C-alpha cells in the first residue's frame, strides 16, 4: 500500500506526512520557472484555472517571493467556461498581484461558434487553439508556461519540458530537442516560441498531495456537491446556465458529483462522488482505475485527436 493511502487511513486524515518526492518536484519546477524568466524576453503563464494551473501559480509565487512573478497570466476564454471558474480566476489573479490578460477569439464569437452549433472539434479549434495563437501573436510572447503533465495523455507523455513551436505555433515531435541532465535549450529565431511545462514530471496524485500539503485553493467544482446534471453519451453534463439545450423530455436532476478535470462545461463530464475534501479526493483517486481525462469530450473526437490538436497549436 502506498504511503499516501496509509496516511489517509490514520486517525487524523488531514495529517499527511511530508513527502520528500514533493520537495524534489517543487525544486525542479521552481528551477524551470526561474530559468525561463531569466532566458526569455517576454514569457507568460497560461492560467486555465484548473488544479494544475493552481499548483503552477503557487509555484511561481514561491519562486519569486517576496516579489511578484515577472510575467503576466493569460486566460483564453472560450465563453463556455463554468461560472465558478471565471469567479475563481479573477480572485486568484487579484490575490497574486499579477497582470491578467483575457483573450476571446472575437472572430469566432462573430461567427457564432459554439459546442452545440458547430461541434466540439470546431469549437475547440476556433475558440481555444486559434484564440491561443492570436493571443501569443498579439502580445509577442516568446515562452508560455502550461500545466500539462506527461501522465495525462499519450501525446503529452513524449512532450519535452521546453516544447519548441515554429512561427506558426505548430508542434513537431521530431523537431524537439534533447534535455539530458535537465539542461534546456531555449534558443529560438524571431517568430518562434517555446511552450514550457514545469509540471511535466508530476502525476495527478502528486498534484493533489501538494495541494493538500501547501493548502492551495482550488475551484469548488473539484469537490462533491449536489449539482444539476443531464446524462449524454455516458457523460454527466452539468447545467451551468440556460444556454444548454435540453432534448425533448430531458429534465436535469440533482446528483452529488464533482469534476476531476475542468474545461468548457458542455464538454466536461462530472463523476458521481462523495469526496468533499482533498484527503477524500486522494483516497477516492487511489481506488479508481479510470483515466483523469475520461470526462473530456474533446479527447474523444477521433483517435489521436490530442496529438493532432497539438500539431495545430493547441497547448
Swiss-Prot record:
It comes from Alkalilimnicola ehrlichii (strain ATCC BAA-1101 / DSM 17681 / MLHE-1). Residues 287-315 are annotated as: Disordered. With CysN forms the ATP sulfurylase (ATPS) that catalyzes the adenylation of sulfate producing adenosine 5'-phosphosulfate (APS) and diphosphate, the first enzymatic step in sulfur assimilation pathway. APS synthesis involves the formation of a high-energy phosphoric-sulfuric acid anhydride bond driven by GTP hydrolysis by CysN coupled to ATP hydrolysis by CysD. The lineage of its organism: Bacteria, Pseudomonadati, Pseudomonadota, Gammaproteobacteria, Chromatiales. Pfam families: PAPS_reduct. This is Sulfate adenylyltransferase subunit 2 1. Belongs to the PAPS reductase family. CysD subfamily. Keywords: ATP-binding, Nucleotide-binding, Nucleotidyltransferase, Transferase. Its EC number is 2.7.7.4. Residues 293-315 have a biased composition (Basic and acidic residues). It catalyses: sulfate + ATP + H(+) = adenosine 5'-phosphosulfate + diphosphate. Gene3D superfamilies: HUPs. Heterodimer composed of CysD, the smaller subunit, and CysN. The keyword ATP-binding applies. One of its GO terms (biological process) is sulfate assimilation. InterPro entries: PAPS_reduct_dom (IPR002500), Rossmann-like_a/b/a_fold (IPR014729), SO4_adenylTrfase_ssu (IPR011784), Sulfate_adenylyltrnsfr_sub2 (IPR050128). Pathway: Sulfur metabolism; hydrogen sulfide biosynthesis; sulfite from sulfate: step 1/3. GO terms for molecular function: ATP binding; sulfate adenylyltransferase (ATP) activity.
Amino acid at each position: 500500500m502506498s504511503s499516501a493511502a496509509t496516511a489517509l487511513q490514520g486517525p487524523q486524515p488531514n495529517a499527511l506526512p511530508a513527502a520528500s518526492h514533493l520537495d524534489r518536484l517543487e525544486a525542479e519546477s521552481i528551477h524551470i520557472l526561474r530559468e525561463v524568466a531569466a532566458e526569455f524576453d517576454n514569457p507568460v503563464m497560461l492560467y486555465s484555472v484548473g488544479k494544475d494551473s493552481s499548483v503552477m501559480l503557487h509555484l511561481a509565487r514561491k519562486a519569486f517571493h517576496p516579489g511578484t512573478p515577472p510575467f503576466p497570466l493569460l486566460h483564453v476564454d472560450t465563453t463556455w467556461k463554468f461560472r465558478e471558474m471565471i469567479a475563481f480566476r479573477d480572485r486568484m489573479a487579484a490575490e497574486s498581484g499579477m497582470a491578467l490578460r483575457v483573450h476571446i477569439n472575437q472572430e469566432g464569437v462573430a461567427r457564432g461558434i459554439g459546442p452545440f452549433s458547430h461541434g466540439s472539434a470546431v469549437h475547440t479549434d476556433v475558440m481555444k487553439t486559434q484564440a491561443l495563437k492570436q493571443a501569443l501573436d498579439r502580445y509577442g510572447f516568446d515562452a508560455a508556461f502550461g500545466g500539462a503533465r506527461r501522465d495525462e495523455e499519450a501525446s503529452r507523455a513524449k512532450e519535452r519540458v521546453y516544447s519548441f513551436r515554429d512561427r506558426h505555433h505548430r508542434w513537431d515531435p521530431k523537431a524537439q530537442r534533447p534535455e539530458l541532465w535537465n539542461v534546456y535549450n531555449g534558443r529560438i529565431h524571431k517568430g518562434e516560441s517555446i511552450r514550457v511545462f514545469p509540471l511535466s514530471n508530476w502525476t495527478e496524485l502528486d498534484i493533489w498531495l501538494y495541494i493538500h500539503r501547501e493548502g492551495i485553493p482550488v475551484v469548488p467544482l473539484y469537490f462533491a456537491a449536489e449539482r444539476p446534471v443531464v446524462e449524454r453519451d455516458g457523460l454527466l453534463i452539468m447545467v451551468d446556465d440556460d444556454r444548454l439545450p435540453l432534448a425533448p423530455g430531458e429534465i436535469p436532476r440533482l446528483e452529488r458529483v464533482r469534476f476531476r478535470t475542468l474545461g468548457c462545461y458542455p464538454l466536461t463530464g462530472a463523476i458521481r462522488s462523495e469526496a468533499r475534501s482533498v484527503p477524500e479526493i486522494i483516497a477516492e483517486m487511489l481506488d479508481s482505475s479510470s483515466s483523469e481525462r475520461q470526462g473530456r469530450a474533446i479527447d474523444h473526437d477521433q483517435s489521436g485527436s490530442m496529438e493532432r490538436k497539438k500539431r495545430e497549436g493547441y497547448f
